[in-house]
Amino acid sequence: MNKTWQISVPGSTANLGPGFDSIGLGLSLYLQLTVTLQDTWAIIHLDDNGPKEFELEEHLLYVIAKKVAEQYGQQLPACRVEMASELPLARGLGSSAAVIVAGIELANQVCGLGLSVQDKLNLSSQIEGHPDNATASVLGGLTISSMDEKGNVDTFHINKIDASFVVYIPNVELKTSESRSVLPEQFDRAYAVHASANANMLAASLMARDFQRAGRYMEEDLFHEPFRAKLIPEYSEIRTAAKKNGAYGTALSGAGPTLISIIPSTIAGDFVQTMKKQFPEHQVIVTKADEQGIQVREYMKRLL
């Protein structure tokens, strides 16, 4: 009998328009790990949403777990890790943040680190470089966060969001580094004030659960979407069609290329069917806000 852990981490969307690098939302699309202690390391991907070929020492999950264990003075024991993911790579659905959060939790469990939720928020955000996706994967729900120069994260968290979300996933990858390369190095003061005001209105509307207004401000970003739009397949067409069919608003999911709409849950079925017909080159999926964040179950497993 070997000790085994099942670790579930929600994917996420970041920004929701003008909430650049600070607003995140956990989604009901998951990275699932089954981790079993054994004599040698093995990482097995059970689907296509993972690297097809890799060296163990370069796999992000292993790199993060080993780094965290060593940071706390522990040696990471060998494990068999089976990974199943609903998060396509480089599509703007928090796949890398989910693996980072999973790696931290793997080290926490197999090394008995006893990490607090705050520890996980800090570690994951420091590794990611910003707290939007990381906090959403740790906590679930809506997160509005700030990280100081020492890497300490402060998060406002709402776990229940009474709306549905539709993602439009194109069959192309877009690396975050490429998407960041088109952004300006600086803005003038008046532009920055306007952009910040829109971000403030988005955050306030989400906190007030005023999704009509939140949807409006999702489409009023000035920090990144005007510059990234040219990289995104059917960016304007999807936004226009979504609004026509009843969406509150549509924005890039993270750095793209996926787009995400917030919609009333009552129209979800008809909305998705209509958008699928209009955009057959995209995978159109309705999802909800995850309300729990990272989940862990421990049990004993008999190895054959």
Swiss-Prot record:
ATP binds at P88, L89, A90, R91, G92, L93, G94, S95, S96, A97, A98. Pathway: Amino-acid biosynthesis; L-threonine biosynthesis; L-threonine from L-aspartate: step 4/5. Keywords: Amino-acid biosynthesis, ATP-binding, Cytoplasm, Kinase, Nucleotide-binding, Threonine biosynthesis, Transferase. InterPro entries: GHMP_kinase_C_dom, GHMP_kinase_C_sf, GHMP_kinase_N_dom, GHMP_knse_ATP-bd_CS, Homoserine_kinase, Ribosomal_Su5_D2-typ_SF, Ribsml_uS5_D2-typ_fold_subgr. Gene3D superfamilies: 3.30.230.10, GHMP kinase, C-terminal domain (3.30.70.890). It catalyses: L-homoserine + ATP = O-phospho-L-homoserine + ADP + H(+). GO terms for cellular component: cytoplasm. GO terms for molecular function: ATP binding; homoserine kinase activity. Belongs to the GHMP kinase family. Homoserine kinase subfamily. NCBIfam families: thrB. This is Homoserine kinase. It comes from Lysinibacillus sphaericus (strain C3-41).
